[in-house]
């Protein structure tokens, strides 16, 4: 509100006096019932790992023997012991407040030298329960902040540190939607069916990995969202351009970005400063609101002591369209899968009300998040240690627990709703290995089974090209090479094309060497001495072979030309979550 008053023309001094001494009436957007629910769930021990820790804020002043003064804090304490133990992972989180006090006393002994003394009354200690949390609930249809949690544990005072508004932390994989996929679907020419080869990937000196270090081959954007796959996300941002992803993130209301964030790590939420919980919630509320950003607001009106309106946000609000309503719906549909098939199953609460969301963790689980929404409300929960300490990966589910339990209570008694599908959405069958139009008899005869799937599209982005990741070749049954016109026994086999080295697809790949290797076992006399046969991949039996010199080669969706070598390749499509395969990814720096 201070910024709003100064923006309205009041000086900083006037604004301060009005807020703290002016007898203002503030019409808050806070819902007391929701706030109580969020406070209770944020402080409910059953939502957290059993091994709670305690950290502390420390400050004391020492008068040195030479008469100078030096201030010591919890940060100097941490640096002191990291250096003393030669351990960069040294932590000053302890199992009880008593252990904290004992550690502080030991530190004071360790830093005091002969003739030094602690200045009386200078010591200040504030012990904090860890891990900590931040939580924001927004009504996306109005932008009103209904509840805000700045931390858990006993409140030490008024106007204290609020982790939801005052602290920037890494958003991890929750930023895949904000910094990559929203832009990719809205303006980058991508669809939920678009695929990337989930395979080893290095750009310059930076090697990107999925959180479980596995690879899934050709993987659709839908499945990459569902399973939080890093490599697919980074390759997608590389395709559409970092500048585009950065611009969209800014449009979503993320104000903490810097030019140093204009790199591929943007896709994974590896940011210079991080984001606030409030702004991340506002970004997800934009998607929930059909792509329209409404600046989060904490009040509707501010009146002076005489009842005069000083500030009015009832009908005035910073608003803009960030993404098309079709893009918002497609992202939402993919994020619904996260709760049913992906990394967010634990977050889902028992209700017929539709739910969508995205998980996020960062390197060594220093941050863990769940960002989710319903047709009613958007809520983001962050968890982590104030000093950025590591967390066990098995103990980072508490943001999902808090979100599930709080949102379940908030939605009690509300009417069952789904997200409204806008005009301009259609569905069609594609090949899940390319995201394009399937080749008849080929994409459905991949060695692993049919790769056909149905996906939703904006009507302007429905694929028209044919699959470019499948090809059918006539193979000599005797040599295993591509059949020549003289091979008497041929079989038609479907191969993958376009995979990179290290991809799981490579096992089924017809690479350039194979494509240029024609059988040399047979010549014209082979047809005289043998009864030729050809095996059709769609039929287990055999059919009479062709001897006119046009049967050999690649079979595709387009009519081929020429003799000796067959026709060219078509195109196909990448699939929706349930049919594509891909490794679960991680984000931030190693998130999922």
Predicted regions and their residues:
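Active-site rim segments in enzyme catalytic domains, especially the processed small/beta chain
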Residues: 164-192, 200
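Mid-domain, small-residue-enriched loop/turn segments at the edges of structured enzyme/sensor domains
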Residues: 207-210, 241-282
């Amino acid at each position: 509100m201070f910024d709003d008053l100064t923006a309205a023309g009041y000086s900083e001094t006037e604004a301060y006096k009005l807020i703290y001494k002016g007898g203002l009436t503030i019409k808050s957007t806070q819902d007391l019932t929701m706030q109580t629910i969020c406070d209770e769930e944020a402080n409910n021990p059953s939502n957290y790992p059993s091994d709670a820790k305690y950290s502390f804020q420390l400050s004391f002043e020492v008068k040195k023997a030479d008469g100078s003064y030096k201030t010591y804090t919890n940060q100097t304490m941490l640096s002191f012991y990291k250096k003393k133990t030669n351990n960069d992972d040294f932590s000053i989180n302890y199992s009880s407040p008593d252990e904290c006090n004992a550690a502080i006393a030991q530190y004071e002994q360790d830093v005091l030298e002969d003739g030094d003394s602690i200045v009386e009354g200078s010591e200040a200690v504030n012990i904090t329960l860890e891990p900590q949390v931040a939580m924001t609930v927004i009504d996306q249809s109005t932008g009103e902040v209904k509840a805000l949690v700045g931390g858990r544990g006993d409140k030490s005072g008024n106007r204290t540190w609020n982790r939801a508004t005052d602290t920037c932390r890494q958003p991890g994989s929750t930023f895949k939607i904000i910094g990559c996929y929203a832009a990719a679907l809205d303006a980058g020419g991508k669809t939920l069916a678009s695929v990337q080869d989930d395979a080893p990937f290095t750009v310059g000196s930076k090697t990107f990995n999925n959180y479980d270090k596995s690879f899934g081959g050709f993987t659709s954007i839908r499945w990459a969202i569902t399973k939080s796959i890093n490599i697919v996300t980074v390759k997608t941002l590389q395709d559409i351009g970092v500048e585009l992803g950065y611009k969209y993130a800014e449009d979503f209301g993320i104000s903490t970005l810097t030019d140093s964030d204009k790199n591929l790590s943007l896709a994974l939420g590896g940011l210079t400063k991080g984001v606030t919980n409030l702004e991340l919630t506002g970004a997800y509320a934009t998607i929930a609101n059909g792509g329209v950003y409404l600046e989060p607001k904490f009040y509707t009106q501010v009146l002076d002591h005489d009842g005069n309106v000083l500030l009015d946000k009832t009908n005035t609000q910073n608003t803009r369209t960030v993404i098309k309503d079709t893009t918002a719906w497609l992202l939402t549909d993919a994020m619904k899968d996260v709760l049913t098939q992906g990394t967010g199953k634990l977050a889902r609460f028992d209700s017929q009300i539709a739910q969508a969301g995205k998980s996020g963790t960062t390197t060594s689980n220093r941050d863990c998040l769940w960002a989710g929404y319903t047709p009613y409300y958007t809520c983001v929960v962050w968890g982590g240690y104030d000093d950025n300490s590591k967390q066990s990966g098995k103990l980072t589910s508490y943001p999902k627990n808090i979100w599930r339990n709080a949102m379940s209570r908030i939605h009690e008694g509300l009417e069952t709703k789904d997200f409204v599908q806008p005009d301009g959405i259609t569905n069609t069958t594609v090949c899940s290995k390319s995201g394009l139009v399937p080749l008849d008899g080929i994409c459905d005869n991949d060695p692993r089974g049919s790769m056909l799937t149905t996906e939703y599209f904006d009507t302007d982005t429905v694929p028209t090209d044919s699959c470019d990741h499948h090809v059918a070749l006539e193979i000599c049954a005797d040599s295993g090479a591509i059949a020549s016109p003289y091979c008497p026994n041929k079989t038609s086999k479907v191969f993958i094309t376009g995979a990179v080295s290290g991809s799981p697809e490579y096992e089924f790949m017809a690479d350039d060497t194979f494509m240029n290797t024609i059988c040399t076992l047979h010549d014209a006399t082979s047809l005289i001495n043998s009864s030729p046969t050809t095996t059709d991949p769609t039929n287990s039996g055999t059919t009479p072979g062709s001897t006119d010199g046009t049967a050999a080669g690649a079979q595709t969706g387009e009519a081929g030309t020429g003799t000796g070598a067959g026709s060219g390749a078509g195109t196909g499509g990448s699939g929706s979550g349930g049919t594509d395969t891909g490794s679960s990814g991680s984000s931030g720096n190693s998130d999922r």
